[in-house]
Amino acid sequence: MSEEIIRLVNVTKEYDGVQVLDNINLYILRNEFITLLGPSGCGKTTTLRIIGGFENVTGGDILFEGKKINDVPPYKRKVNTVFQQYALFPHMNVFENIAFGLRIKKVDNKAIYAKVLQVMELMNLKGFEKRNIDSLSGGQRQRVAIARAIVNEPEVLLLDEPLAALDLKLRKEMQLELKRIQQRLGITFIFVTHDQEEALTMSDTVVVMNEGKIQQIGSPIDIYNEPKNVFVADFIGESNILDGVMLQDFLVHFHGRRFDCLDKGFSANEEVDVVIRPEDLKLVAAEEGMLTGEVQSVVFKGVHYEMMIQSSEFCWMVHSTQMEEVGNEVGLRILPNDIHIMKKVKGD
């Protein structure tokens, strides 16, 4: 079983009386790739900055290896940070940028040379030692920034949306590269992003945040397949979300009819939210469908078609490799394991 390295206990943070973190409780394991995911203003970057020591908590505690570090300054914490703006030194070449932290620590030149070359090889920067920062591409600069952080051998690396400035193709490549580096180094990565694909691609654990609160913690598969509430279901991928009534265990009513499902533990006739992913809806002939509807629009998305299908009570988003023409009447089949039931949150 993995060892816990960081724990946040009842952490709150206020700016000018406005609460931006509300009672955050979270533990992070050694050698884990964990992602804080959420929309702008959800508190994910504030959480990262608190772990790094760049922000103080209003309430609660930060524990590192079981010891309280609330008052420990950033430079004394066993963490390094890669910011969205890489903050590289333009007057230094690549080698000296990476070596900077080691020189501050007064590491001897022989050790600096060996460590920097080792990290440059890991980051696929071999041969770039004397290159000026201004001559590098965005992806190369990002590699230098990460190399500068990991050469100091931190126990935890904090990454604040480091891929945000890269183009789509390079961003996808760097997602896999970061995961490879983390596995090779065996250190804890805490990654912040608003990009769901990044979180699902790289992470061992995803922490979904909204309005200063943790909404759900789980593996990428759990977060996607078993969202805890409507926010998570809507934020992670696409979803069809309907009002329903849980009649009894394994039986739910929505869209004017009853459906078998796999959920239990709700009160009889409890109002619930019903979530069905677009890729889980099966297109069939109209006479074979559990529901029928008319195709309103069709958009080719590369690996599938996205169709909007208007039934009697709802406009369904459907993802399918099978294309239907606009105006066609089609049937939809919904299987029990494709239906996700969740408790309604007050205000829904």
From Swiss-Prot:
Annotated binding of ATP, by residue: G38, P39, S40, G41, C42, G43, K44, T45
Membrane topology value: Peripheral membrane protein
Gene giving rise to this polypeptide: potA
Subunit and partners: The complex is composed of two ATP-binding proteins (PotA), two transmembrane proteins (PotB and PotC) and a solute-binding protein (PotD).
Primary localization class, coarse: membrane
Name of the protein in its database record: Spermidine/putrescine import ATP-binding protein PotA
Protein task: Part of the ABC transporter complex PotABCD involved in spermidine/putrescine import. Responsible for energy coupling to the transport system.
Record organism: Desulfitobacterium hafniense (strain Y51)
Keyword Membrane: yes
